A protein has these predicted regions:
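Helix-adjacent hinge/juxtasegments
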Residues: 48, 53-86
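Residues at secondary-structure transition points
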Residues: 19, 36, 59, 87, ...
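PIN/NYN-family metal-dependent endoribonuclease catalytic core
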Residues: 4-5, 15, 21-52
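Active-site neighborhoods of divalent-metal-dependent phosphate/nucleic-acid chemistry enzymes
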Residues: 70-107, 113
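Short, flexible helix/strand-to-coil boundary loops that buttress conserved ligand/catalytic motifs
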Residues: 14-15, 49, 120, 137
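Acidic, PIN/NYN-like endoribonuclease modules and their adjacent C-terminal/linker elements
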Residues: 94, 101-107, 113-145
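A secondary-structure boundary/capping signal
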Residues: 6-7, 37-38, 112, 128
Length: 145
């Protein structure tokens, strides 16, 4: 499966390794799931992970981002053509949606699924980490993960 990972899930996955975000991150790091990215997403990951409140080591963050860059799939994204009546709660979420749509991701995994309520019109589903894990397990049991 190919996914876009919202920054909130990446951070939660590093902080709470046994909870659903951590298990999703394990799937990415283990190669069972392919992370889709563009430079804007990796820049946001870097900026957020560097915040002092998380206390992640700079070398660890650099190593993680290098791995995600190498193991993931780079996407050249484009702005979404959204009708005016669609309101995006957080415009900083748009790069994640754009990567998901252009790359035809299987899912955008986020802790804020309601921020991406417009994605189904593009054939993309925003899922919580727990929902994604259920779908991944179902697909794996059918040999499609």
């Amino acid at each position: 499966m190919r996914i876009v990972l919202d920054t909130n899930v990446l951070v939660a996955g590093l902080l709470y390794v046994r909870r659903p975000p951590g298990r999703v991150l394990d799937l990415v790091l283990g190669g069972s799931v392919v992370l889709l990215w563009d430079d804007r997403l990796l820049e946001e990951y870097a900026e957020v992970l560097a915040r002092p409140k998380f206390a992640f080591g700079r070398a660890d963050v650099r190593a993680l981002l290098d791995y995600l860059r190498l193991a993931g799939e780079f996407t050249v994204s484009q702005p979404l053509d959204l009708p005016r009546q669609i309101k995006v709660p957080d415009p900083q979420d748009l790069p994640f949606a754009e990567v998901a749509v252009v790359s035809r991701a299987d899912a955008l995994v986020t802790g804020n699924a309601r921020h991406f309520a417009f994605l189904p019109r593009f054939g993309i589903q925003a899922m919580t980490p727990a929902s994604f894990l259920l779908r991944w397990q179902e697909d794996a049991s059918r040999g499609r993960a």
